[in-house]
Curated annotation (Swiss-Prot):
UniProt name for this protein: Zinc finger protein with KRAB and SCAN domains 1
Record-stated family: Belongs to the krueppel C2H2-type zinc-finger protein family.
Function according to Swiss-Prot or TrEMBL: May be involved in transcriptional regulation.
Record's keyword annotation contains Lyase: no
Region (Disordered): 1-51, 163-187, 260-372
Cross-link (Glycyl lysine isopeptide (Lys-Gly) (interchain with G-Cter in SUMO2)): 27, 180, 226, 277, 296, 301, 336, 373, 410, 438, 476, 558
Cellular compartments annotated: Nucleus
KRAB domain location: 225-304
GO molecular function list: DNA binding; zinc ion binding
Length: 561
């Protein structure tokens, strides 16, 4: 008993052994346990099962060049994935947990990945708990020094007064004590904290552990900077909107020239604008480099959005100018003396105009994040990245066709469709085949034509395996298996699986015979029947030669030999 107790005690630091005077409850470290286990007789030890991490790395690092073909590569990948995930042992939830854990570890900083690999977490919750414990102890250890100025603002760190300092150290001691006696690894704190943050009695961590801890602290400080930067940008953006709205209101008031009432309001707005500019300048100075960086970053964007708002306000300004030039009796508003205040109606007008400017400013397409589909169609629910695309899409539901062909009068909903249609009249065929030189008016027709040369048949029937170069041919073929006959004759009710068959059938009722023989003038409903008819005339030409003439011609050939 004493031997085992002394062996366990050797795995502890001197400080941990002197913490209690009574019974010392310790947990042997992973390295000591492994040394003790392998120190026994090797003949008594069973071969440990393969590590799943080994199979995972084999699965992820598998290369196609190591195989002799795609089928062998796929089978090898299935085998490696089976060895890693072990579906015969693990449930679906466990397999899902393994995949999520792998992805979670891959997005962590390198230092944290190396640190977590030592503990081999079995689930994502266990990995998160380890990181949260580490972060809690690091936050308890961090006591900022006496640093002032822009660097403190950028990091979001505020100097601690003596009361806060003492409470911070108390919190650190409590967290450290809890961490030592938890079920986690005993050297977690000493490994996690860099030497500058670990108290003096503890030994210093190695450089790799210090880098890992600094990564955690850097992530925290970056999060603080991002939050503060976002607040600064929102403040500047809001003030930019207000200043732009005020400038537009001042311009409108000068154009309308409605008397001293608007002049007084313009002076008030100019005063407010100068006050806002002073506030922005003061706030930018206090934020230092952060505000300057955001002003530079969003300068061009604000300028572009300002031009958009001016274009949106162009038509209302022209309308206002026309109304101003129309003659008429003087209104009560013009006769009203200047009192230095606006009436309720004029205040409402000013607020309404300012609100519409803000709404237009906030709804500009440039405000939306890149790739975000914020414009949604109310009819079908389809979303678009730009409002112009949504407007073009809505034409489909309304049935509007504003683009009309000047040649035939046919109308289209999109201008691009009109351009393609006009090539029928002009005969333009800009898409030419490199193999045979044949030209097409549509690029899609060229793609279908090129499959004739390449022999590509990407559309395959699931029933019989027959392949086709066009999807329409596959659709027609599949009707043979399904028995679908969507084309029905309105005269007799007979149905067909192809439209061409229905057209041929209708000629029976209409007695139309478009295919006419040039020799005898006989007409037929089908081109195939005309081809068979041509053979009759061909046999007639061969029968013009009598048998006697043929025998004489044969004798002549023999004499030549």
């Amino acid at each position: 008993m004493m031997t085992a107790e002394s062996r366990e005690t050797t795995g502890l630091s001197p400080q941990a052994a002197q913490e209690k005077d009574g019974i010392v409850i310790v947990k042997v470290e992973e390295e000591d346990e492994e040394d003790h286990m392998w120190g026994q007789d090797s003949s008594l030890q069973e071969t440990p099962p393969p590590d799943p991490e080994v199979f995972r790395q084999r699965f992820r690092r598998f290369c196609y060049q190591n195989t002799f073909g795609p089928r062998e590569a796929l089978n090898r990948l299935k085998e490696l994935c089976h060895q890693w995930l072990r579906p015969e042992v693990n449930s679906k939830e466990q397999i899902l947990e393994l995949l999520v854990l792998e992805q979670f570890l891959s997005i962590l900083p390198k230092e944290l990945q190396v640190w977590l690999q030592e503990y081999r977490p079995d689930s994502g919750e266990e990995a998160v708990t380890l990181l949260e414990d580490l972060e809690l102890d690091l936050s308890g250890q961090q006591v900022p020094g006496q640093v002032h100025g822009p660097e403190m603002l950028a990091r979001g760190v505020v100097p601690l007064d003596p009361v806060q300092e003492s409470s911070s150290f108390d919190h650190h001691e409590t967290a450290q004590s809890h961490f030592k006696h938890s079920s986690r690894k005993p050297r977690l704190l000493s490994r996690a904290l860099p030497a500058t943050h670990v108290p003096a009695p503890h030994h210093e961590g190695n450089p790799r552990d210090q880098a890992m801890a600094s990564a955690l602290l850097t992530a925290d400080s970056q999060a603080m900077v991002k939050i503060e930067d976002m607040a600064v940008s929102l403040i500047l953006e809001e003030w930019g909107c207000q200043n732009l709205a005020r400038r537009n209101l001042n311009r409108d008031s000068r154009q309308m020239n409605l008397g001293n009432v608007f002049s007084q309001g313009s002076e008030n707005r100019n005063g407010n604008e100068s006050t806002s500019k002073a506030e922005v300048k003061e706030d930018s100075t206090s934020h230092g480099e952060i505000a300057g960086r955001f002003q530079k970053e969003f300068g061009e964007k604000r300028e572009q959005q300002g031009r958009v708002v001016e274009r949106q306000q162009k038509n209302p300004e022209e309308k206002t100018g026309k109304e101003k030039k129309e003659p008429g009796p003087p209104t009560a508003k013009e006769k009203k003396p200047s009192t230095g205040e606006r009436g309720p109606r004029e205040k409402g007008k000013g607020l309404g105009r300012s609100f519409s400017l803000s709404a237009n400013f906030n709804n500009t397409p440039e405000e939306a994040p890149s790739g975000a589909k914020t414009h949604r169609c109310d009819e079908c629910g389809k979303c678009f990245t730009r409002s112009s695309s949504l407007i073009r899409h809505k034409i489909i539901h309304t049935g509007e066709k504003p683009y009309e062909c000047n040649e035939c009068g046919k109308a289209f909903s999109l201008n691009s469709n009109l351009v393609l249609h006009q090539r029928i009249h002009t005969g333009e065929k800009p898409h030419e085949c490199n193999e045979c030189g044949k030209a097409f008016s549509h690029s899609s027709n060229l793609i279908l034509h090129q499959r004739i040369h390449s022999g590509e048949k990407p559309y395959e029937c699931n029933e019989c395996g027959k392949a086709f170069s066009q999807s329409s041919d596959l659709t027609k073929h599949q009707r043979i298996h399904t028995g679908e006959k969507p084309y029905e004759c309105s005269e007799c009710g007979k149905a067909f699986n192809r439209n061409s068959y229905l057209i041929l059938h209708r000629r029976i009722h209409t007695r139309e015979k478009p295919y006419k023989c040039t020799k005898c003038g006989k007409a037929f409903t089908r081109s195939s029947t005309l081809t068979l008819h041509h053979r009759i005339h061909a046999r007639e030409r061969t029968s013009e030669y009598s048998p006697a003439s043929l025998d004489a011609f044969g004798a002549f050939l023999k004499s030549c030999v």
